[in-house]
């Protein structure tokens, strides 16, 4: 710990103690006063929270603190997510003595060996990291109301979740049936993002299997995502060196890779008959089930046996990889299938040639493939003559009947429609099948086992595929504020593809499914409306309500207003006054004003949050805003346990101090961007905060009780502008922009002010107090310290947002002085040897204002001589937008008084004595004709050498 970090930690500990003693962040409903209810995703205590969590929690805290300044009653609570397998899996691995995991926990989290030994108990592990993470959040300075803290295995929470699930079931949104899910073979259970290493969501995709059969009756199921291209197949590809098997599958003897047989075994019955190398099947001919053509099997080392079935169909006219591979073999057989405006018959060939791709190893092949596939899918139409290739092996009238079907539903149809038709037709005709796969493989369970897709029977699902439910979810996304705005498209896309999702497991911590024993509600399903639970748990405890009293009637009354307090009291034994108080608490705080999380949770938690709110609550209780921030890197690299570069939040606080850490997480990137946390930046920000502390001390020590001048008014005006910019940035959740204004730009203004005055005035202390309030959401501890030094009353955390009286004339005065100094420096006579500078001021400010409209007559009417009016109009045109705006908004401005006020500053800046005269002063000498040349806003300048 450096001396600087120790300085900030000591200040933070002092103020955190006072906050806690004063219960300043434990709000109560205040009728008639607007509230602001914000939450951030509660953490899993399977490890200590790190700076990635810290960023999300900081953004929420900045908003919470800002809205306190705006007069809102603010609630920012926190809980801990014990549900699911993450805690259980880590405990099992530690209990088994896994050296890698144990070393990770000791090295990254600094867990002592004696504590590691106890972590084979999952609840001990959870409590350890729960307590440590809570302490880290407190030391980080989060303004959390800890009186509402809970865990997801608390009995009160479990009764709440069971009520939610009964509601979903009664609405027909929970179903039981057959569906593909991500699956851990070791634990024999479905998995989601929170069950996997690095919280990676298993993305389940569907291959269409097309059955090509040889003369011996062996079937080669080619796996494809583009079944509409099967009429254009010229050959199949098989990896000659890969391991394949002959197996019984779907009533056929099939040839597939050994890996595919393993993956398929979780979806259907697969019986391996024998093993073989791929080369055994190279050179055979197989029949296309759609066209009837016989096509050869070629060898190809690019075929990955872990993808699909290890059998790939080749469509060189529409697949760049296939085209290049066949070209390398000296074969060019192209069958056109799809018409796309702007392309010829063979898009794959065209794109390959345009990109100059010479070999199968050219990285540009991937780009070429994306272009062809995307363009054909979005703009492509199947050729009308494709029907001529259908069923050539069939006898009449079967051939004509089949071609008629393809003419109606396939030929001339958009690619997306043709794809849907043929995939369905192949399965119904028993000429193909379906295989599910993890498309973003490899994905690993936290136990280390690779995830596969299993088709489950009798599994409980939340049916996110329900069309009406999807439509209601879309309405909420459309209405609510989502930051960043471009994330709305991501939410809409997620709503579109979401389908049934397994909602229960047979192992792990959590809430039992209320109607089916042996099932535990999984972690991404019990964490969708818990924000409502924060509003009531405090009073549930205060009134001593037992878990068994938290019945369906209780929750219906509290959250939905159903039934009367008297009726519910009779059924539950909960006192009427308790029921009413809890209902009032919920009514005051809900709806949620802002939900804060990482962008990686958009495809799951955040979208489930939307779905479940619209299903459970009436429209007026739907959430109002989601903030989805980017990831946190460390020194340019993704943080991961394997790299040993995860930085726990408590360690980061110890290294830098809480406020420098907060400043760095705020300043390094805007909310929607990924943030690269760098040690050098954190240390630079610590120096900046120390400089702010020193500057305010200097202001306090040197402030004089004298009348304020133009320079003091300029300070007030500039800080007022910064306050306006910061307020707007906070309101728009532009946290970086706000931090730049209050930590760097405001400091620069004060530095400039102190450079212009010999002694600051008491007005400067008023500006400093306003500044401290504005910086408090970012760096609250140093703000409290400075607030106390500046004589502020109470906590700065609860001070109202400052209002400074900003005079545009003060800003114009400073810009005027800057322009004058620049003009002097541009005069050739200025420099070493200059003895004095004589400045002549034309005080007819009304002429300059009149010149803004560019009309000579208007300027003359204001009193200017005609020859002066034209010069003045030309001058005003050269002024920048800022000066012209200030000129328009300023009613009175005295150039003479301004220069007198700034005289000492101008002399110090130029290093030369100055004399100031008004052109109206008859006793003033006209040196070099500069007196009569002076214009409003453009003084005459004479330099004597």
UniProtKB/Swiss-Prot annotation:
Residue numbers covered by motif 'HIGH' region: 43-53
The residues forming a coiled coil are: none
> What positions does the record give for the motif labelled 'KMSKS' region?
638-642
Q: Which UniProt keywords apply?
A: Aminoacyl-tRNA synthetase, ATP-binding, Cytoplasm, Ligase, Nucleotide-binding, Protein biosynthesis
Q: Name one GO biological process term.
A: leucyl-tRNA aminoacylation
What sections of the protein cross the membrane?
none
Write the signal peptide boundaries.
none
Q: Which GO terms describe its cellular component?
A: cytoplasm
Instruction: Check the record and name the PROSITE patterns matching this protein.
Output: AA_TRNA_LIGASE_I (PS00178)
Q: Where does it mainly reside? A: cytoplasm
Q: Which reaction does it catalyse?
A: tRNA(Leu) + L-leucine + ATP = L-leucyl-tRNA(Leu) + AMP + diphosphate
Q: Which GO terms describe its molecular function?
A: aminoacyl-tRNA deacylase activity; ATP binding; leucine-tRNA ligase activity
Q: Where does ATP bind?
A: 641
What subcellular compartments does it reside in? Cytoplasm
Keyword Disulfide bond assigned to the entry: answer is no
Q: What is a single Pfam family found in this protein's UniProt entry?
A: Anticodon_1
Under which EC number(s) is this enzyme classified?
A: 6.1.1.4
Q: Which CDD domains match?
A: LeuRS_core
PANTHER family, alphabetized: LEUCINE--TRNA LIGASE, CYTOPLASMIC, LEUCYL-TRNA SYNTHETASE
Extract the HAMAP family matched here.
Leu_tRNA_synth_A (MF_00049_A)
Q: Which family does it belong to?
A: Belongs to the class-I aminoacyl-tRNA synthetase family.
Its name, as the record gives it, is Leucine--tRNA ligase
């Amino acid at each position: 710990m450096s001396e600087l970090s120790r300085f900030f930690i000591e200040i933070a500990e002092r103020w955190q103690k006072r906050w806690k003693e004063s219960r300043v962040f434990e709000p109560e409903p205040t009728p008639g006063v607007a509230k602001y209810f914000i939450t951030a995703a509660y953490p899993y205590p399977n490890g200590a929270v790190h700076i990635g969590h810290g960023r999300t929690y900081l953004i929420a805290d900045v908003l919470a603190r800002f809205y306190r300044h705006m007069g809102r009653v603010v609630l920012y609570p926190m809980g801990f997510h014990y549900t699911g397998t993450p805690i259980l899996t880590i405990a099992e691995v530690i209990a088994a003595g896994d050296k890698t995991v144990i070393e990770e926990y000791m090295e990254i989290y600094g867990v002592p060996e004696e504590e590691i030994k106890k972590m084979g108990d999952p609840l001990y592990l959870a409590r350890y990291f729960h307590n440590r993470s809570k302490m880290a959040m407190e030391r980080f300075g989060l303004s959390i109301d800890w009186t509402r803290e809970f865990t997801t295995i608390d009995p009160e929470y479990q009764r709440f979740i069971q009520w939610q699930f009964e509601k979903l079931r009664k609405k027909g949104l929970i179903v039981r049936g057959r569906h593909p899910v991500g699956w851990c073979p070791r634990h024999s259970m479905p998995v989601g993002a929170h069950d996997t290493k690095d919280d990676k969501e298993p993305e389940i995709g569907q291959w269409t299997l097309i059955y090509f059969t040889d003369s011996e009756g062996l079937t080669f199921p080619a796996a494809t995502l583009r079944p509409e291209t099967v009429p254009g197949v010229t050959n199949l590809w098989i990896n000659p060196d890969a391991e394949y098997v002959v197996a019984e599958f779907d009533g056929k003897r099939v040839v597939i890779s050994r890996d595919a047989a393993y993956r398929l075994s979780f979806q259907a019955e697969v019986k391996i008959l024998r093993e073989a190398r791929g080369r055994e099947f190279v050179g055979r001919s197989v029949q296309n089930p759609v066209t009837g053509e016989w096509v050869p099997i070629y060898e190809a080392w690019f075929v990955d046996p872990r993808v699909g079935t290890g059998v790939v169909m080749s469509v060189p006219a529409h697949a760049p990889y296939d085209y290049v591979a066949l070209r390398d073999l000296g074969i060019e057989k192209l069958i056109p299938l799809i018409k796309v405006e702007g392309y010829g018959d063979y898009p794959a060939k065209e794109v390959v040639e345009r990109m100059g791709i010479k070999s199968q190893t050219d990285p540009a092949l991937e780009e070429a493939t994306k272009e062809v596939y995307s363009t054909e899918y979005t703009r492509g139409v199947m050729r009308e003559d494709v029907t001529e290739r259908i069923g050539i092996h069939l006898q009449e009238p079967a051939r004509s009947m089949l071609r008629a079907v393809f003419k109606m539903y396939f030929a001339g149809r958009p690619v997306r429609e043709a794809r849907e038709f043929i995939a369905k037709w192949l399965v119904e005709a028993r000429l193909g099948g379906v295989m599910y796969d993890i498309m973003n493989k490899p994905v690993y369970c936290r136990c280390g086992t690779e995830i596969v897709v299993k088709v489950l029977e009798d599994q409980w699902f939340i049916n996110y595929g329900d069309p009406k439910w999807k439509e209601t979810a879309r309405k909420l996304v459309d209405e609510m504020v989502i930051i960043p705005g471009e994330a709305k498209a991501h939410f809409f896309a997620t709503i579109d593809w979401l389908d049934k999702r397994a909602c229960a497991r047979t192992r792990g911590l959590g809430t039992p499914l209320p109607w089916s024993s042996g099932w535990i509600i999984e972690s991404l399903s019990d964490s969708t409306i818990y924000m409502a639970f924060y509003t009531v748990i405090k009073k549930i405890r205060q009134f001593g309500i037992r878990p068994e009293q938290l019945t369906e009637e209780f929750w219906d009354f509290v959250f939905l207003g159903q039934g009367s307090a008297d009726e519910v009291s009779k059924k539950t034994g909960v006192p009427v006054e308790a029921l009413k108080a809890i209902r009032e608490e919920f009514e005051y705080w809900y709806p949620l004003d802002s939900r804060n999380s990482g962008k990686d949770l958009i495809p799951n938690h955040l979208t489930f949050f939307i779905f479940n709110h619209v299903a459970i609550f009436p429209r007026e209780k739907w959430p109002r805003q989601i903030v989805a921030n980017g990831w946190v890197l460390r020194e340019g690299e993704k943080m991961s346990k394997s790299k040993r570069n995860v930085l726990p939040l408590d360690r980061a606080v110890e290294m830098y101090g809480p406020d420098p850490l907060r400043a760095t997480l705020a300043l390094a990137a805007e909310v929607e961007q990924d943030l690269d946390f760098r040690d050098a930046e954190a240390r630079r920000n610590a120096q900046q905060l120390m400089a702010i502390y020193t500057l305010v001390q200097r202001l306090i020590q040197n402030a004089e009780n004298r009348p304020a001048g133009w320079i003091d008014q300029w300070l007030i005006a500039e800080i007022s502008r910064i306050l306006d910019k910061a307020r707007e940035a906070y309101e728009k959740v532009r946290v970086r922009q706000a931090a730049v204004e209050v930590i760097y730009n405001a400091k620069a203004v004060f530095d400039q002010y102190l450079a212009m005055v010999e002694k600051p005035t008491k007005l400067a202390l008023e500006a400093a107090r306003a500044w401290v309030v504005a910086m408090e959401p970012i760096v609250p501890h140093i703000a409290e310290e400075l607030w106390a030094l500046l004589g502020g009353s109470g906590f700065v955390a609860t001070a109202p947002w400052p209002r400074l009286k900003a005079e545009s004339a003060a800003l114009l005065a400073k810009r005027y002085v800057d322009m004058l100094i620049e003009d002097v420096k541009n005069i050739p006579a200025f420099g070493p040897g200059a003895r004095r500078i004589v400045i002549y001021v034309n005080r007819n400010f009304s002429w300059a204002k009149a010149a803004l409209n560019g009309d000579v007559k208007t300027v003359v009417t204001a009193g200017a001589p005609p020859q002066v009016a034209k010069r003045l109009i030309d001058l005003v045109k050269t002024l920048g937008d800022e000066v012209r705006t200030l000129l328009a908004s300023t009613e009175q401005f005295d150039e003479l008084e301004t220069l007198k006020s700034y005289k000492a500053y101008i002399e110090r800046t130029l290093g030369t004595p100055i004399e100031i005269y008004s052109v109206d002063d008859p006793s003033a000498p006209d040196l070099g004709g500069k007196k009569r040349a002076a214009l409003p806003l453009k003084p005459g300048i004479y330099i004597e050498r």
